[in-house]
UniProtKB/Swiss-Prot annotation:
InterPro entries: Peroxin-22, Peroxin-22_C_sf. Belongs to the peroxin-22 family. It comes from Saccharomyces cerevisiae (strain ATCC 204508 / S288c) (Baker's yeast). It is a single-pass membrane protein. This is Peroxisome assembly protein 22. One of its GO terms (molecular function) is ubiquitin-protein transferase activator activity. The keyword Cytoplasm does not apply. The keyword Transmembrane helix applies. It is found in: Peroxisome membrane.
């Protein structure tokens, strides 16, 4: 077999040199970027612009179960109607005047779709699961059975669907949680 021609050897050698040079340049640039970014911010970068907004939005998303004690809190519901707040109103634990007052507050801001009326506790917890909000705020003492037992009202699996369940009967805690 005859030896390869000199021009073919030169083309192969040139192609190999150019490929190696490109690989070295790309690797050098990558290392340079890693080193300079590590010096500037020590590797801790803030999230990109849109994800910051999403985190703030997720932190404020609340599901409020409107029991009698929460309905009695001195809160201006009009201020929270535009936020990421959904009110779950168990019809058996709510009086008509409060339903009307809350409904009017949300209607003024055209957010009446954020009020969900639930006929049963199973339906209420199903809504909590499907909404998947960041916080669920309630006073479970308002939902104890008529026999007076302190059986837990919050289902065990609810932590898979809601990040934080705030269950308190202290008025200041409820107001602070609702308003922040």
């Amino acid at each position: 077999m005859p030896p390869p021609s000199r021009s073919r050897i030169n083309k192969t050698r040139t192609l190999g040199i150019v490929g190696t040079a490109i690989a070295v340049l790309v690797t050098s640039y990558y290392i340079y970027q890693k080193v300079t970014s590590a010096k500037e911010d020590n590797g801790a970068r803030p999230p990109e612009g849109d994800s910051v907004k999403e985190n703030k939005k997720a932190r404020k998303s609340k599901c409020i179960i409107m029991s009698k004690s929460i309905q009695g809190l001195p809160i201006k519901w009009e201020e929270y109607a535009a936020d990421e707040v959904v009110l779950l109103v168990p019809t058996s634990h709510t009086d008509g005047s409060m339903k009307q007052a809350i409904g009017d507050a949300f209607r003024k801001t055209k957010n009446e779709h954020k009020i969900i009326y639930c006929d049963s506790m199973d339906g209420l917890w199903s809504c909590v699961r499907r909404l998947g909000k960041f916080q669920c705020i309630l006073n479970s003492r308002d939902f104890t059975s008529s026999g007076g037992s302190d059986a837990a009202v919050v289902p065990e699996d609810i932590g898979r669907f809601v990040k934080f369940v705030v269950d308190s009967d202290v008025e200041d805690v409820l107001i602070d949680t609702l308003c922040n």
